[in-house]
């Protein structure tokens, strides 16, 4: 994983400070100095095509050519039975499942319709599909990760041969709460338009509503995540740290401008590709900020090590400052290559925080519950020990520690915002490097680099969650989500659907969701 070189560029800094676009003077220099390569060790095979597959083995996905003879159709059906993703028909929706129409996940379908599913590809084709023989040396699908609520697989999009990620949102319609949560995440993934925030490229065609149990979302495939990089033995330069932190805050500024709290920022939810481009992912716990302080918010959020003190202390109302606390913990972890506050329990978590920050004032604890305040006041009075942050690593410079101390503030109202953190001088080099050779918003010409007028864009309008207020039954939400997915189908692209007969799909459908360690944390009950 390498970073390209970036020279200090006066015009770019002028563009940032003045808010105007600028072209770099002179030619853009191309002697790029490559930083240590950080390949994700156990994901290395993403870069290498696997051994050739034959029809009938678990090939990833297949488009199917329009059949001209019954023999060709039979061959196509055999190949498609192995493929997990297939281009669907343009109008596959009927009042009830039509003969030969795949009803969707095999697990949800009656046996006789499962048998008909094998004939799906034979029954409906689309003229934009390619010849199946072109696609036979595709890597098999494989699981690549588990989120708060869902499992992610890498697959090949049969329409263009690109590797993409496929996220299964399972058990969507168990109850009204899970329906609303999944619909919220789905709407967010379709709303996001930012290079440092993962968004939906596509949603697989749903089956007829009677068989509609799972939702499959296609997103960009990223090679690694910050957790894997931090625990790897490869060195992380200060340039890596700056460009990662810059992108985390750039994505967070966008999310917060949309009025969204992520509520589970941790290294494993920060995806990184081989060029060091970073994207915030997993919005299973995200929600719109609650401006009415009298309304209670759930405390079952944020993985413990990254949980802000106000949540640990049982505050019933919190702000997007909880995400900034998590970023501070990650910043320290990037510098020190170990978890900053690694406690066995939520109470010990709070004690480790006060060891570093000192005993908080009553004002800083004003939103805490009485039991948590009593715990702090019972204990010894602690002095802050912030200078210990300089011992994280040689990269913990004055500028780095200064910014870190603005993030790790006990009182959420005094914690720095994503917008203000981006203006900190520590991130100037990260911004320069990102916009000189990593971003999609600036471009190079023969006379130099043309910079965007807005380095850290926000969204307008905000994400609107008023749709949730009127959701009253599982059946109603199911119909609304089904309709929403149909409306999302991107223009004239061939819609994709799951092939429930493929071996890969059967493995996918049975893969477990969220390992026990990944489950959302339980709330701390203060006596």
From Swiss-Prot:
GO terms for cellular component: cytoplasm; cytosol; nucleoplasm; nucleus. One of its GO terms (molecular function) is ATP binding. It holds the Pfam family Pkinase. The active site is at 264 (proton acceptor). It comes from Homo sapiens (Human). PANTHER family: MITOGEN-ACTIVATED PROTEIN KINASE (PTHR24055). Contains a TQE activation loop motif in which autophosphorylation of the threonine residue (Thr-298) is sufficient for kinase activation. This mode of activation contrasts with that of classical MAP kinases, which contain a TXY activation loop motif in which phosphorylation of both the threonine and tyrosine residues is required for kinase activation. One of its GO terms (biological process) is positive regulation of receptor signaling pathway via STAT. Residues 26-54, 122-131 have a biased composition (Basic residues). Activated by dimerization and subsequent intermolecular autophosphorylation on Thr-298. Activated by the non-canonical Wnt signaling pathway, in which WNT5A treatment leads to activation of MAP3K7/TAK1 and HIPK2, which subsequently phosphorylates and activates this protein. Other cytokines such as IL6 may also activate this regulatory circuit. Belongs to the protein kinase superfamily. CMGC Ser/Thr protein kinase family. MAP kinase subfamily. Keywords: ATP-binding, Cytoplasm, Kinase, Magnesium, Metal-binding, Nucleotide-binding, Nucleus, Phosphoprotein, Serine/threonine-protein kinase, Transcription, Transcription regulation, Transferase, Wnt signaling pathway. A motif (TQE) lies at residues 298-300. The keyword Phosphoprotein applies. Residues 428-527 are annotated as: Required for homodimerization and kinase activation and localization to the nucleus. ATP binds at residues 144-152, 167. The gene is NLK. Its cofactor is Mg(2+). Serine/threonine-protein kinase that regulates a number of transcription factors with key roles in cell fate determination. Positive effector of the non-canonical Wnt signaling pathway, acting downstream of WNT5A, MAP3K7/TAK1 and HIPK2. Negative regulator of the canonical Wnt/beta-catenin signaling pathway. Binds to and phosphorylates TCF7L2/TCF4 and LEF1, promoting the dissociation of the TCF7L2/LEF1/beta-catenin complex from DNA, as well as the ubiquitination and subsequent proteolysis of LEF1. It catalyses: L-seryl-[protein] + ATP = O-phospho-L-seryl-[protein] + ADP + H(+); L-threonyl-[protein] + ATP = O-phospho-L-threonyl-[protein] + ADP + H(+). Phosphorylated on Thr-298. Intermolecular autophosphorylation on Thr-298 activates the enzyme. This is Serine/threonine-protein kinase NLK. Residues 1-125, 124-416 are annotated as: Sufficient for interaction with DAPK3. It is found in: Nucleus; Cytoplasm. Its main location: nucleus. Residues 1-304, 434-527 are annotated as: Required for interaction with TAB2. The keyword DNA-binding does not apply.
């Amino acid at each position: 994983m390498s970073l390209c070189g970036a020279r200090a560029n006066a015009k770019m800094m002028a563009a940032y400070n003045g808010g105007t676009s600028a072209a770099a003077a002179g030619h853009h220099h191309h002697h790029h100095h490559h930083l240590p390569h950080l390949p994700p060790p156990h994901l290395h095979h993403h870069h290498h095509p696997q051994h050739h597959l034959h029809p009938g083995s678990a090939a990833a996905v297949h488009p199917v050519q329009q059949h001209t003879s019954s023999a060709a159709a039979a061959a196509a059906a055999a190949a498609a039975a192995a493929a997990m993703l297939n281009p669907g028909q343009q109008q596959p929706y009927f009042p009830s499942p039509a003969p030969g129409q795949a009803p969707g996940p095999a697990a949800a379908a009656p046996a006789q319709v499962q048998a008909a599913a094998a004939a799906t590809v034979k029954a409906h084709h689309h003229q934009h599909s390619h010849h199946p023989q072109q696609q036979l040396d595709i890597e098999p699908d494989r699981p690549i990760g588990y989120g708060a609520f869902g499992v992610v697989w890498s697959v090949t999009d049969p329409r263009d041969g690109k590797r993409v990620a496929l996220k299964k949102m399972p058990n969507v319609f168990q109850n009204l709460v899970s329906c609303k949560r999944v619909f919220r995440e789905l709407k967010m993934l379709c709303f996001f338009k930012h290079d440092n925030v993962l968004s939906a490229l596509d949603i697989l065609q749903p089956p007829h509503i009677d068989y509609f149990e799972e939702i499959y979302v296609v997103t960009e495939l990223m090679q690694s995540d910050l957790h894997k990089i931090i625990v790897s033995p490869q060195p992380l330069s200060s340039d890596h740290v700056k460009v990662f932190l810059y992108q985390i805050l750039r994505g967070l500024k966008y999310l917060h401008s949309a009025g969204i709290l992520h509520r589970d920022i941790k290294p494993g939810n920060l995806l990184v590709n081989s060029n060091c481009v970073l994207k915030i992912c997993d919005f299973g716990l995200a929600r719109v900020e609650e401006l009415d302080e009298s309304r209670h918010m759930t405390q079952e959020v944020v993985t413990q090590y990254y949980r802000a003190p106000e949540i640990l202390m049982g505050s019933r109302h919190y702000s997007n400052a909880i995400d900034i606390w998590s970023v501070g913990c990650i910043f320290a972890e990037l510098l020190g290559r170990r978890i900053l506050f690694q406690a066995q329990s939520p109470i010990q978590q709070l004690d480790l925080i006060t060891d570093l920050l000192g005993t908080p004032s009553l004002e800083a604890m004003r939103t805490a519950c009485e039991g948590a305040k009593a715990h702090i006041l019972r204990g010894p009075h602690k002095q802050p020990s912030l200078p210990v942050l300089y011992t994280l690593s040689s990269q913990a410079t004055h500028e780095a520690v200064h910014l870190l101390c603005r993030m790790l503030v006990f009182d959420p109202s005094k914690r720095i915002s994503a917008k203000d953190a981006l203006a900190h001088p520590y991130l100037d080099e990260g911004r320069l490097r990102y916009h000189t050779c990593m971003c999609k918003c600036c471009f190079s010409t023969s006379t130099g680099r043309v910079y965007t007028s807005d380095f850290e864009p926000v969204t307008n309008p905000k994400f609107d969650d008023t749709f949730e207020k009127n959701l009253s039954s599982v059946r109603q939400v199911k119909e609304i989500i089904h309709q929403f997915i149909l409306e999302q189908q991107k223009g004239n692209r061939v819609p994709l659907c799951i092939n429930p007969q493929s071996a890969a799909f059967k493995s996918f459908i049975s893969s477990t969701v969220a390992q026990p360690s990944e489950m959302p944390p339980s709330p701390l009950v203060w006596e």
